[in-house]
Amino acid sequence: MADFRIEKDSMGEVKVPKEAYYSAQTQRAFENFPISGIRFNSAFISALGYVKFVAAKVNEELGLLKKPVSEAIQRASKEIIENKFDGDFVLDIFQTGSGTSSNMNANEVIAKRANELKSGTDIVIHPNDHVNFGQSSNDVIPTAIRIAAVISVEKDLIPSLRHLQKTLLEKGKEYKDVVKTGRTHLMDAMPITIEQEFSGYARQIELGVERIESSLFRMLELPQGGTAVGTGINTHSEFGKRFAATISKETGYSFIEAKNHFEAQATVDAPVELSGQLKTVAVSLMKIGNDFRWMNSGPNSGIGEVELMALQPGSSIMPGKVNPVIEESLTMVCAQVIGNDATITIGGQSGNFELNVMLPVVAFNLLQSIEILSNASRNFADRSVQGLIVRKERIESMVGKNPILVTALNPLIGYDKAAKIAKTAFSENRSVLDVAREMTDLSESELENALNPINMTKGGFSE
């Protein structure tokens, strides 16, 4: 028995795998683009399902699709939304720049499944004439990008980042009374508490969420209804507005029709903006992850201020070695997101006249950035921050010998004399307090008050 069937399109006959739900145009694209094996993720496929579901519903309401046809398309599209047919979305992301191949992939899968599900009609549901009615790849794909990104950010990324922010604040509060050596240029500086340092990390994440939320407002404008070039040719004049209202009801997010369809289809400025904010979050996480690696370094020959969770052996040759694997995973994710942003930026420049022609690569990289940032942020919170232990005794011993503590004496004895004390303390491996007793006329109480590390974390002048 043959393992393929014959399908026809406007260009002729094509052999298609027998069990596949896609048809001729998808098969042609599959053969044309054997590039990377990278396919769209489930979020994008689900978004295509939403577009087709809502389009069928709205076109029925407008009297443009018969009810049995619309209902069958809606039922099939629901299964796409639920990712039941992800295996039939077989196309490489490096394909036609409009994403037409992936739009037709959705149209063909939904048409075949709708014909299986239909009742009350003898009409053969067609990928173009029914599933794609009143639509073009040029508004479907940009719309799907926005829907997928908004849902993924709201459902996954923002909750993960807020969880990380909360975890950082809680860990800082757990060690709020621990004073450590601050560092600038990787060199000893004035003291800071663990809580203060971790509050800075948490604020980075909080601001990242705010930046992302701000950029989402532009992502809520949907190109759907513009069809081929933004004029709305071959669709109802109310389609775009009704589509936005219906998709909002279906998803729970406040989508609106694009204020200008020519901008919405000719550019991907909104996705480029969102990617830029994702890059900023990646930069923040890279800094935090690297700080954790430095604080954990050693444990004997490095800074060794904290002890991260021992999750797996770190070396195939050195027994007992444990590495900061979660931080390394996190920082690699950050590097990928930063690289994705560069790709998206180049993609955004490829909007020639009325259409961007790098939509698939923009879609893939944007959604990958959202996905891996979501997963890495939560993993970092749960498998690193929560289990972090501060090595109090080591921190206290290092703070006591920090020559930069002498900075607190500047208002009392002047910069030059304070510098001499710092140099002596460092060269003789003594505490600043011990040297200051010999080199100043300050009383013991004055010195102890001025050189108390906890007092230095509260700002102001020494008294």
Where are the predicted features?
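Conserved, well-structured ligand/cofactor-binding cores
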Residues: 1-463
